[in-house]
Amino acid sequence: MFRIGQGFDVHEFAEGRPLIIGGITIPYEKGLLGHSDADVLLHTIADACLGAIAAGDIGKHFPDTDPAFKDADSAVLLQKVWEFVREQGYELGNLDCTIIAQKPKMAPHIESMRKRISELLETSIDNINVKATTTEKLGFTGREEGIASQAVVLLQKK
């Protein structure tokens, strides 16, 4: 049996925070605002995985009202989600992600993100695709106010 999940997340830029996307710290003058480390891509992937098994979303499992998750490492959160997915009897078919950002340029970091995500999801890098696009200076991402991401995951029963 196959299950498909879709994820979407948005975070606004904030001064004085590191920019962490896909488990990788990216040199930039701003980071993303959030209760955790605000890794927009890993949050999106977690939501896609949870959606595929009809288990809600990241906010249900790691609420931003819980001080235990303040400044949490999103890689650890994704690992917990993935452990839960595997306990339900699923493994990864493939994952396709899109980062939507005017700046900074993501291309130099894509392969590092793919590698890190493949480690977190215990799969071959060949099952992970990460790409980036801009909105041609339209909307909040085009005005460089934040970053969005989308992901689609295919899970298969072990």
Curated annotation (Swiss-Prot):
Recorded superkingdom: Bacteria
Q: Name one Pfam family in it.
A: YgbB
Which residue numbers mark the site Transition state stabilizer?
35, 134
A GO molecular-function term, please?
Answer: metal ion binding
Q: A GO term (biological process) for this protein?
A: isopentenyl diphosphate biosynthetic process, methylerythritol 4-phosphate pathway
In terms of InterPro entries, this protein maps to: MECDP_synthase (IPR003526), MECDP_synthase_CS (IPR020555), MECDP_synthase_sf (IPR036571)
Q: In which pathway does it act?
A: Isoprenoid biosynthesis; isopentenyl diphosphate biosynthesis via DXP pathway; isopentenyl diphosphate from 1-deoxy-D-xylulose 5-phosphate: step 4/6
Q: Do you know which SUPFAM superfamilies this protein is assigned to? A: IpsF-like
Q: Which PROSITE patterns match?
A: ISPF
Q: Which UniProt keywords apply?
A: Isoprene biosynthesis, Lyase, Metal-binding
UniProt catalytic activity: 4-CDP-2-C-methyl-D-erythritol 2-phosphate = 2-C-methyl-D-erythritol 2,4-cyclic diphosphate + CMP
**Can you tell me which residues bind a divalent metal cation?**
9, 11, 43
Record family assignment? Belongs to the IspF family.
Subunit and partners: Homotrimer.
Protein name per its UniProtKB record: 2-C-methyl-D-erythritol 2,4-cyclodiphosphate synthase
Organism encoding this protein? Bacillus cytotoxicus (strain DSM 22905 / CIP 110041 / 391-98 / NVH 391-98)
